[in-house]
Amino acid sequence: MPAAFIENRTYDEIAIGDSATLTRTLKPEDIQLFAVMSGDVNPAHVDPEYAHSSMFQEVIAHGMWGGALISTVLGTEFPGPGTIYVSQTLRFSRPVKVGDTITIRITCKEKFEHNKHMIFDCLCTNQDGQKVIAGEAEVLAPTQKIKRERYELPEVTISDRWARYHRLIARAKGLSAATAVFAHPVQAESLQSAVAARDSGILRPVLVGPEKELRAAAEQSAIDLKLCRVVNAPHWRAALAQALDMARSGDAEIIVQGAIPTHEFLLPLIASLRTDRRLSHALYIDVPSYPRPFIISDMMVNIEPALEDKVEIVRNAVDFAHIMGIAEPKVAILAGVDTVMPKMRATLDAAALCKMADRGQITGAVLDGPLGFDNAVSPEAARGAHLNSPVAGQADVLIAPDLEAGNMLAKQLEHLADAVSGGVVLGGAVPVVLANRNDSIESRVASLVLALLVANHARQPRKELR
């Protein structure tokens, strides 16, 4: 813990040969913060792919990161508060890489009584004792004693939103593009996501709707539809019927909702695409405060699912988790409390689902419930509640008790927790992407990537259904 006070050493208190040191270990966040603060986005510091091909073969610190640490010693300790920089020279001998531990040593070299200036040798060495930076600083030293309470620095959280988004998009790399039919995409957001997915090689979009209206919307938003197939349909009902026909005939692997009310969109969808599974929605969500992405289901399709419906929701979510690379997902069945309460149906359903998993009726995952949201995602909360299970505090899948709870949970995370997310409807003949008027283009494209992953999985030889 840092000292409670910050105190200087005056000109008269420092003798030639006196020194002070500071030791820091370079973390990736240090490089990111320095880039944000300075605007220095030299790819040698911020682009791992570029850095790998550079002479140093990995990301290195900005040179002035070490210079800033020299300034830290001079300004906070030796001499400390009241010090004014006059000049600084630096010579860089070798790069500082992530994980390097750097020791900064500042040594008094000369003093000038007439103007209270001092000259310091500045040396930065790494954990192997190798010199990385050397230089000389001249300062106007303080002549009056200063002792102040140390300022408590605010916590800084780095939003790696774009990195998390691109990690998700990268999952489509190497996969063959899928034909996706967009039903009545007459608003700019639908068209933009279709074109973005096309340009990324994710999809071959087919736009079904009133052609004049589609092209007018595209022209108004400067969207190029030249490489998109457009199928004329006079209204949204005809567009949806055409989309469903394409899915049933195998001409489309994905259906995407356009400007069609969700309840009007889902009813014919369920009737036309239902298999031996119940349709359910899964949201793949990545928040910076959780160590890995997780899945929430169901927030869009099943309003008040009965126990038998939840069995299918869990099975769909588990299959989806497998597609996303989670070999044995930890599934938390959410409720308002962690104990079985006869008057709370969500707790009874949770207990029944877990027993079904124990008996092999639900396989491919580890289930626990009922669990509150806090005890599902927080190891500290789970320990405090004395919940000892492989799921508590580290869930990969959250099964909401009903649509309202799932929807509110997901939207809270999306709007208040800097979440990157995408969703897909599972259990049908083809994956389906639902549209929300508040979805960003990145969220829409993320959903299309998820649909591609599900469609690609469907291309593989099917395993026996559980």
Task: Briefly describe each language-model feature range.
Residues G17, F34, G63, I70, ...:
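Buried hydrophobic positions in well-ordered alpha/beta secondary-structure cores of metabolic enzymes
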Residues T21-T23, T89, A134-E138:
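Well-ordered beta-strand positions in beta-sheet-rich domains
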Residues P2-I16, K97-S159:
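HotDog/MaoC-like acyl-thioester-processing domains
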Residues T72, F92-R94, C108-E110, N126, ...:
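A residue-level detector for short acidic-glycine micro-motifs
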Residues T76-D100, I104:
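Mid-chain, well-packed structural core segment of small domains
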Residues S93, L123, L334-G336:
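Short loop/turn motifs enriched for small/polar and acidic residues
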Residues I158-V206, E211-V391, D396-R466:
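Anion-binding alpha/beta catalytic cores of soluble intermediary-metabolism enzymes, centered on
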Residues P2-T83, S87, I146:
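Hot-dog-fold acyl-thioester-processing enzymes
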